[in-house]
């Protein structure tokens, strides 16, 4: 039991007949390009603006000797994730009876904090993201543009949406914090994308120790499986999941007394090797568990990059789950470095309109 998280214990208690964890020897196979490791030898970056910003060697692991809770959060946000990315963005909301809602989309991204970006327009930015819905038909061509800076206090997130009904682009300042997108059906917030993203000012952050825990790792069977095989009642098909004993840095986020968020208390687990978030528990105001999230890691050797194959969010009240950002070997395959850098004109309101069409 010592190696299980509270979220995993809750899964066993809620689904005693179906939830299992297959434990394998630890492989510690994560890797990123050597350039990232070389740049990280200069030591820690600096947190600025009360932790809302970072100043340091672009492309490095910002805090290789992390000691503060937000160091771990920034390491996760700025970990290596490719350069000029092109890929799919499917999602599934699965009900207890096995029925589901599914959707699909396209995404392109420019990750500015990495050693291979030379474009001057990336200065001061984390990156830029564009997404377009392709399914279901009623939402087709609805699109989103997000530009994220390295200092949320000085330069807050900029977001725009394209509405295919009106054929207009408008600013979307509400796409942050606990904004609930229609696709997630209330199972995930804007700041839960990729584990955690965006401003950090609504929480008090604290370290909860470094421990060994069973975590979803090297899930190649899931990556190679037929999509129909992995989507089962209550949770993903655990036949395709594997867990290893992993060293994780645990960080708590507790809502400030003068702030609001539908996730008042969060416990985040950051993999010590890849620096990425690998699991999370969300608690309500009474500190009773609401959601358990897994972000199973896998080494993409062709890049190399060590990233989540999907994000699975399990809600205990409704017994529904959201599976999104699903990557697989056959469909929705990620291109980590496009043949040529993405044009900056793509990541503008006019570019969003062209991209949506």
Which sequence ranges carry the predicted segments?
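A generic structural motif
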Residues: 132-136, 162, 254-256, 283, ...
